[in-house]
UniProtKB/Swiss-Prot annotation:
It is found in: Cytoplasm. The gene is proA. This is Gamma-glutamyl phosphate reductase. The keyword rRNA processing does not apply. One of its GO terms (biological process) is L-proline biosynthetic process. GO terms for cellular component: cytoplasm. Its main location: cytoplasm. Catalyzes the NADPH-dependent reduction of L-glutamate 5-phosphate into L-glutamate 5-semialdehyde and phosphate. The product spontaneously undergoes cyclization to form 1-pyrroline-5-carboxylate. PANTHER family: DELTA-1-PYRROLINE-5-CARBOXYLATE SYNTHASE, GLUTAMATE SEMIALDEHYDE DEHYDROGENASE. It comes from Vibrio vulnificus (strain YJ016).
Length: 416
């Protein structure tokens, strides 16, 4: 597979997409949604091949469930595409404008990024999600999914490209790297003449590989240690409920709670309440001060080096007692708090200190870390959750898939 040819085609398509009307882009999305449902039999047959190969390869039931498509899930994906149609198209909108002293009207106008390369693992719905969001924002995309969903992704991309042709848009607006050869990923990361941004969606290893090998700007995110600090002024009963939600609602999510920090003045009262709530569900990984108050915990072990740097993605929770909000903040800084962190408190000054000091992409006061999500934020959809500070931060919706250009309008004006 010649990635340079792929890149050139994507760049040409991006120039056409940049001038496509919202109506034309929405037409393509509507056709994609309809064609997903119309071609359900072929898509599900392809997915069955992936599932069977996954079983033969010894994939876990949890992983197989992530790969699985059925009629209900496929209808849900089609409806997600229809939801993207209903979202406001940011392309062409003015961010701000002003009239300069020389009479020039100067504005910043949103424009597509160009070509977005996305490297992702497992779930086939990501193929449609990314393609839909990129199309809505006038971006061409080059997709590289995991080998576990090869047949599913090939069928999905066929549907997308057919829909693009029917809508009068270039089929190369969405392209897929068919071969699972890892060397092609490395080549994609060097395709800076044609690709404007790389978005990895997967574990820390994938992000690290992209960051170290790419000559293209990379969006880093999707992982980081999530913390909750329970302050001495917090409502303890309500805090236990929030901690349970953050840890146990969906422990495999990147915004699930990893480490609980508890003020020493309420630890003796709060930690037994926590144990009573989560016993049998959660394994507690504890430092000595916390352990002293958790004698009734059924599943508990002493924390060892590296435990507080671990994104558990499971029913495991690190627990530590701290002296105050400042020690909690210091702990978070030391242990990669870059994704989602929260404080439970009724103390306004401590809340503001936490908000201003926490280095995470999303910070909450008296709310679960589980809210860091494009749909929950009212963005409608997300392409990734960025934990870096440049270009975009937190859930990346449609606006985050755009850049801007300066537009100056005048009456044959020359610079003095």
């Amino acid at each position: 597979m010649d990635l340079i040819t792929l890149g050139k085609a994507a760049k040409d398509a991006a120039f056409q997409l940049a001038t496509a009307s919202t109506a034309q882009k929405n037409k393509a999305l509507a056709i994609i949604a309809d064609e997903l449902e119309a071609n359900a039999a072929d898509i599900l047959a392809a997915n069955s091949k992936d599932i069977e190969l996954g079983r033969q390869a010894g994939l876990s039931e949890a992983m197989l469930d992530r790969l699985l498509l059925n009629e209900s899930r496929l209808n849900g994906i089609a409806n997600d595409v229809r939801n993207v149609i209903s979202l406001t198209d940011p392309v062409g909108s003015e961010i701000d404008s002003k009239v300069l002293e020389n009479g020039m009207q100067l504005s910043r106008r949103r424009v597509p990024l160009g070509v977005v390369g996305v490297i992702y693992e497992a779930r086939p719905n990501v193929t449609i999600d990314i393609a839909a969001l990129c199309l809505k924002t006038g971006n061409a995309s080059i997709l590289r999914g995991g080998k576990e969903t090869f047949f599913s992704n090939m069928e999905l991309v066929k549907v997308i490209q057919s829909a693009l042709a029917k809508a009068g848009l270039p089929a190369a607006s969405v392209q897929y790297i068919e071969k699972p050869d890892r060397e092609l990923v490395t080549q994609l990361l060097k395709l800076d003449d044609y690709v404007d941004m790389i978005i990895p969606r997967g574990g820390a290893g994938l992000h690290k590989m992209c960051k170290e090998n790419s000559t293209i700007p990379v969006i880093i995110g999707g992982f980081g240690i999530s913390h909750i600090f329970v302050d001495e002024t917090a409502d303890l009963a309500k805090s236990v409920d929030v901690v349970e939600n953050a840890k146990a609602q969906r422990p495999s999510a990147c915004n699930a709670l990893d480490t609980l920090l508890v003020h020493e003045r309420i630890a003796e009262q709060f930690l037994p309440m926590l144990v009573a709530k989560l016993n049998g569900k959660v394994t507690f990984v504890v430092e000595p001060k916390a352990k002293a108050y958790m004698t009734k915990a059924e599943q508990v072990r002493d924390a060892s080096e590296g435990d507080f740097d671990t994104e558990w993605l499971s029913y495991t929770l690190g627990v530590k007692v701290v002296a105050d909000v400042q020690e909690a903040i210091d702990h978070m800084r030391e242990h990669n708090a870059s994704h989602s962190d929260a404080i439970m408190t009724n103390h306004l000054q401590n809340a503001e200190l936490f908000i201003n000091s926490a280095g995470s992409a999303a910070v909450y006061v008296n709310a679960s870390t589980r809210f860091t999500d494009g749909a929950q934020f009212g963005l409608g959809a997300e392409v990734a959750v960025s934990t870096q500070k440049l270009h975009a931060r937190g859930p990346m919706g449609l606006e985050e898939l755009t850049s801007y250009k300066w537009v100056g309008k005048a009456n044959y004006l020359s610079r003095a």
